From Swiss-Prot:
Main location: membrane
Annotated transmembrane regions: 37-57, 74-94, 100-120, 128-145, 151-171, 185-205, 213-233
InterPro entries xref list: MannP-dilichol_defect-1, PQ-loop_rpt
Topology of the protein relative to the lipid bilayer: Multi-pass membrane protein
Gene this protein is translated from: MPDU1
Species of origin: Homo sapiens
Name assigned to this protein: Mannose-P-dolichol utilization defect 1 protein
Residue intervals of the PQ-loop domain: 39-105, 159-216
Amino acid sequence: MAAEADGPLKRLLVPILLPEKCYDQLFVQWDLLHVPCLKILLSKGLGLGIVAGSLLVKLPQVFKILGAKSAEGLSLQSVMLELVALTGTMVYSITNNFPFSSWGEALFLMLQTITICFLVMHYRGQTVKGVAFLACYGLVLLVLLSPLTPLTVVTLLQASNVPAVVVGRLLQAATNYHNGHTGQLSAITVFLLFGGSLARIFTSIQETGDPLMAGTFVVSSLCNGLIAAQLLFYWNAKPPHKQKKAQ
């Protein structure tokens, strides 16, 4: 039994998905209904799934912009505010030594979001401005992650996530409403973000116990749900120039 307990399954699960005491509880004592350990397993599994999914979640949006050679319908201010929120979550989590499974998607979403920022500027004829923005962002990120930045500043940055998310999503919602369509917004990206933010409410409570993190994801879920609802509402709506081509 001891050899089985220390076998490949244990090496796979401990410590990535379970602490050793929970592994023993579930797979040595076979207490498969041990709720605290099941919650840890579910939270870790969801967290790692979200992180893995985040590698691809915004690529449909990137490819849609590249394919159309246009960022029509995307609010640059909204994308930038989302970048601020992702940066705040990432810096706050690194500073507080939270487990990577509780915030890792912020890193990958940040890289994809800053790519979208640049593409929006590029297709608006502001390529030089876009390059300068990338350089400035990299410099600011280095400063935020350095010992020069006090913890109070990092906490304030995380606290600013809620207004940043709300304002950013409302700007995108207003753009959609004004245009009467969702332009180059990717439905796959929007629905994946909505599902991910919902799951993150549970994982942030379970893995960090931080009310600031959990509150951010509650607000993010509500705002992402608004954009998802607009996508469904405007599903068959097209920009005016595409309507003319269809006619």
